[in-house]
């Protein structure tokens, strides 16, 4: 899925990497010493602003041969509410420092509406630019004093142009651009595109092949194709009704998650919910294996039969309800694309736009299901013994879903064992039934070879884990965290770290967070990363239970979702723009923490 997402957003997302050697010791300028060809940053990008009514306009005059990065523009405020920021998109550019980016080579104007400003109101503007000749300036920060503005209707006359004061460099963040996480890349890449719904539609098609959505194929097939011989038109109608139920439910759930934040997301992924859904999938799988037959009470069957007789070929109401239920079942599978979609909705603040986008995402998930329902009878061979094999195969597919859900709350050893056991059972069954297949010759031999290779591939992860050498196991124990449970304990640890003059890393963790476990397995215990992390005071907040103190801590740190990692410098100050919200591989994570520790 990660590979699919990477391919899909390759043309949309901006990848940022560390800048190359920057900046000398010239105290009177922001440019590198030893080169007289570059002007100071204030001459390269003269920055001014003016205000009219309840709107402030920021103005950059870009010198010829220089450019500003669109991705490095950021605006934040204190004691004032900012409206929707209005600015034009930059032009695509290939930069030796940051790769494919959008830049501004002409004067740039940014309009920002403001309201409800209070005493001490400030607007903090951050930007960064480079010279085409191969030189990059550090990020610049300007603070605009809004408190002097009148909090009421002003005359239409434009105020005199003013120059914002630079932020004190002792507290300003002058780090190089931070690498974007997978979720941030998706959210930023989808923003401000009129064709966003089409992108979400394509993402939905990819999500249709994840472990939680794939088991919906046999369910839909039994609903639409299993109720009798249906025409293509009837099958198309019922499948569309099914997908509409799933899409509407998915859209509502997504909007609730985006508006309610992490609390609802955590509740939907609570261990009790995950265990309940896993039991449901196992129950369905056992019925596919013929252990028992699931059937409704006779009274309900009679009611459904009567309703089915009234609606020839199937119940649209029942199909819609099943689609809605499938939307609920699939909701805990918050893979990186779905998390990015929800992050996009939360950032946009436009529920209508967000609703349309998430509806398109769910419709994309339903497209493969519709194709199976409409063309299934033509694509599949005639009825025969193969149907029992297909039924058993779907049983194994159904068993993959509970493992996918439970690995969020199970130790890695057990999740690895479950995946290996499922693979061994599935490929062992395939090898057992190969001689009973209706075709023979080389096709039967190919099935046997696939089964044998699958058996070895399934057993290897468990063997690698259980028989790992002692050095690998010791490596896993190198990184240890100080556990914190609430805001008070966080403040205590920050105070102790400040006294020790050590930077701090706080990792928000939950058992149901897959990416949190990926951080733990692939990133934190990388030898180079583990060595660099020794310079930090490592804190971890386990919010699995989503208790009151967990919620208070998440709200205090303004955490919208997991994984989230925050950083403080050795002076106890939060490191601006250093937060990570999504999985990051060891190499870019190492660069990230090296910049912070240095």
From Swiss-Prot:
Gene3D superfamilies: Glutaredoxin, Thiol:disulfide interchange protein DsbD, N-terminal domain. Residues 158-180 are annotated as: Disordered. The keyword Oxidoreductase applies. Residues 159-180 have a biased composition (Polar residues). Its EC number is 1.8.1.8. Its main location: membrane. One of its GO terms (cellular component) is plasma membrane. Pfam families: DsbD_N (PF11412), DsbD_TM (PF02683), Thioredoxin_7 (PF13899). It is an enzyme of class 1 (oxidoreductase). It comes from the Bacteria. The keyword Ubl conjugation does not apply. It is a multi-pass membrane protein. InterPro entries: Cyt_c_assmbl_TM_dom, DsbD_gamma, DsbDN, DsbDN_sf, Thiol_diS_interchange_DbsD, Thioredoxin-like_sf, Thioredoxin_CS, Thioredoxin_domain. Keywords: Cell inner membrane, Cell membrane, Cytochrome c-type biogenesis, Disulfide bond, Electron transport, Membrane, NAD, Oxidoreductase, Redox-active center, Signal, Transmembrane, Transmembrane helix, Transport. CDD domains: DsbDgamma (cd02953). GO terms for biological process: cell redox homeostasis; cytochrome complex assembly. Belongs to the thioredoxin family. DsbD subfamily. This is Thiol:disulfide interchange protein DsbD. It comes from Vibrio vulnificus (strain YJ016).
